Amino acid sequence: MTIPSSAPQQQGPARGVQWAKRLLGVCAAGCVVAVLAACGSSSPKTPSTSSGSAATSSSAAAPASLSQLKTMVLQPADLPSGWKGAPYQPNPNDSATNAAMVKCVGGRNSDGDKVAEAHSDDFALGDASISSSATSYRSQSDLESDVAMLHSPKLSPCFEQMMKKQLAASLPAGGTVKSASVKITPGSAGGPANVVATGTGTIKVQVNGQQIPVYLTVAFITGPLIQAEVDTENVGTPLPASVVNPLVATVAARAVKG
């Protein structure tokens, strides 16, 4: 999503919320994608057992094709009533964002091991949005290093640093990033076993004299030579778990089958 470089003509709280909604696109398309890309660029080490049966079954699997991955991501029928989908729009800054994240965390870039990548529509309802993606890789070692990366103590602070820098450059004139916090937690958080980590983030921006909180979540999912994710963003309040958890479970169930 493109963020205009100049301040909008309309002023007041309503316009501030509109800017916050646009910032969701910046962070979803750049920050969360960069975390996953950096996870795919980590130095291999023994993964946590939280990767479960997905890591074990992938040793004999063939990488999923694009057509297979498209069936794993969220479909319009998966969303509750009222959510409207729009085609995924790639962010032209993804490569630069990924490079910055890799440099911060440390590791090798394994983008060359990607076989295919699919994205769902970007689903929206009011100030909230939900999206998902699934990527296949050539080897089991890619998944093992990625799961290990999610345990790195550098991951959350590097994500925060990158997010603040990216958002600061995207705000309208006079806008400021008051705070940004991100926490990546290994494990399924009580969800499906192939959810290997979850992340939450809170961004507070001040636009047109109004301070607005933006909330993010991400679920990191594995399958046979597959990495998938479900991302959510909302202005003002986090999306309820009653909405998010079933969607994560749906993608996880598809990914684990490969």
Segments and roles (model prediction):
Residues 229-258:
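Surface-exposed amphipathic alpha-helical segments
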Residues 1-37:
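Sec-dependent bacterial lipoprotein signal peptides
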Residues 48-126, 248-258:
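Extracytoplasmic low-complexity, Pro/Thr/Ser/Ala/Gly-rich segments
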Residues 85-211, 218:
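A small/polar (G/S/T-enriched), proline-flanked helix-loop surface module common
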Residues 63-65, 130-138, 234-239:
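Second-shell loop/turn segments in exported
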Residues 208-235:
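Short, well-structured beta-strand
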